[in-house]
Amino acid sequence: MRSQFDKQLAQLHRELIEMGALCEQVIALSSQALTNRDTALAEKVAPLDHEIDRKERDIENLCLRLLLQQQPVASDLRQISAALKMITDMERIGDQADDIAEILLCRAGRPLSAGDTLRDMARATIRMVSESVDAYVRQDVDLAQQVIAADDEVDGYFDRIKAHLIDRIAKGVDDGEATLDLLMIAKYYERIGDHATNIAEWVMFSVTGVHKTEAT
């Protein structure tokens, strides 16, 4: 009985790694589309987001089977409950990468010019997503803590971009619609950073049994 349960736990681990890899792909693809002003790349984001949605349902069903059909001990319950939390954040990363791509597609023929700060923010966010997935793969608490700390950097980028864009709107320098679209894209990156942080916090819970909210 335990042998079968361990096999299913190993399957859960593999499925989460695959879903995490899809999240890395989708955010990298939407960011590349933004940087290169490439609508063909933006069109490839939605199918990946749909694949992430399917993976979320598959993992959720597997977790429910583990809970209902097996007899998990405390450490098993920790892994399963953390997995259920993580897939929610992973699914939202896919959604927000798709939201970025949708803005780019709606502006076909009127490409946005992403400034250096937004490109830096995109790179920082991609790194957070990648490292949160790596932290899960390696069950690495130190790396998870680095991801959590990096969220302040992404928030700082958002604050600077927001202040810059609001100033340009006030001065009538930019097209208002384009400026609002850039602000929305920056907000999506900020949210993706939040989801990567959540994933890292659940990795820490899975390994240590203590969630950040309980440690403060």
Q: What does each model-found stretch correspond to?
A:
Residues 1-216:
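Cytosolic, long alpha-helical scaffolding segments
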